[in-house]
Amino acid sequence: MTTLASLTRYLSDNGHQVAYALRDIDTAKHFHHPNQYLVYQAPVLGIRGPNTTAAYDCADMLLIRGYEDTPYLKLGVEKWQEIFTDYQPDVVVCDHAPSARLAAYITGIPSYAIGNGFSVPPLTIPLQNLHQLENPD
């Protein structure tokens, strides 16, 4: 949220309408001007994947959240598409919302991801295999 706050303020100050889709909709009460923004409940994909003790990278997190389960993932993407149909965004900016980015891509809406090196990994090919860093003991 704090990552998007300055961007939101800049866009609003320059005449753009901004909407949020939040995992925890109660977060909206902490906004600088809470009545200035539309707020949607973000679709949340719960734990569905393999029982693992550690997620080493974002790909592991996606598996845990059900990204290998096509029908389940499709439901989450369709929920995002419903939000996009209602709001009609010109662009989608996501802070760790891979299903929203997938829905935006399918719908033809430009999207951007912001975040840290975990949710937006560096553009290196191949990515470092973090499983190799695990202590074998």
Residue ranges and their predicted role:
Residues M1, I25, H96-A100:
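Gly/Ser/Thr-rich loops at beta-strand to alpha-helix junctions
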Residues D13-N14, V18-P71:
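Conserved nucleotide-sugar phosphate-binding/catalytic loop shared by glycosyltransferases and other
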Residues M1-S12:
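Short amphipathic alpha-helix
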Residues P110-D137:
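Active-site-proximal region of nucleotide-activated glycan assembly enzymes
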Residues A55-S99:
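Conserved nucleotide-sugar donor-binding subdomain of glycosyltransferases
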Residues Y10, L102-A103:
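Hydrophobic/aromatic ligand-binding patch that stacks against planar heteroaromatic rings
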Residues L22-D24, C94, G115:
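Short beta-strand/turn micro-motifs composed of small residues
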